């Protein structure tokens, strides 16, 4: 049972939450696809896959099909940040499909549930609690 860290971005609040969960139900899904948040414990939420990283630290790229590692000539992010105008460099990146060896998956909330994310994760009453 491969586990992954899900980094859940909440566009309303601008906060991110880390959740460790099984990524087996998402194997085969691609960047941009929407899935039910129930898979990672966010009941009622719809989440969109935005990217990720494999166990070696190579980033996923939406324009490379499949789940393989490839060395490609890049001129823009993700996977390469040019220092000078027009700079290109050959870098190793992953494809846009989730595989069992993906250890971090970045997701964004596209549809909200009834309860807030901190409430579902048991974080409610931590830093904003009045004394």
Swiss-Prot record:
GO molecular function: structural constituent of ribosome
Coiled coil (residue ranges): none
UniProt KW keywords: Ribonucleoprotein, Ribosomal protein
Alphabetical list of Pfam families matching this protein: Ribosomal_S6e
Transmembrane domains' residue ranges: none
GO biological process: translation
Entry GO terms, CC: ribonucleoprotein complex; ribosome
InterPro entries referenced in this protein's UniProt entry, alphabetically: Ribosomal_eS6, Ribosomal_eS6_arc, Ribosomal_eS6_CS
Lineage: superkingdom: Archaea
Region (Disordered), start-end ranges: 76-95
Compositional bias (Basic residues): 81-93
HAMAP family attached to this UniProt entry: Ribosomal_eS6
Similarity comment text for this entry: Belongs to the eukaryotic ribosomal protein eS6 family.
Protein known as: Small ribosomal subunit protein eS6
């Amino acid at each position: 049972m491969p586990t992954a860290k899900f980094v859940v971005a909440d566009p309303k609040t601008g906060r991110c939450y880390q959740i460790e969960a099984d990524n087996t139900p998402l194997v085969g899904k691609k960047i941009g696809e929407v899935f039910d948040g129930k898979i990672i414990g966010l009941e009622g939420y719809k989440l969109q896959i935005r990217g990720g990283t494999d166990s070696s630290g190579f980033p996923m790229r939406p324009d490379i099909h499949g789940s393989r590692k490839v060395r490609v000539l890049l001129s823009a992010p993700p996977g390469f940040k040019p220092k000078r105008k027009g700079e290109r460099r050959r870098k190793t990146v992953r494809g846009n499909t989730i595989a069992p060896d993906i250890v971090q998956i970045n997701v964004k909330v596209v549809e909200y549930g009834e309860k807030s994310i901190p409430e579902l994760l048991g974080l409610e009453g931590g830093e904003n609690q009045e004394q």
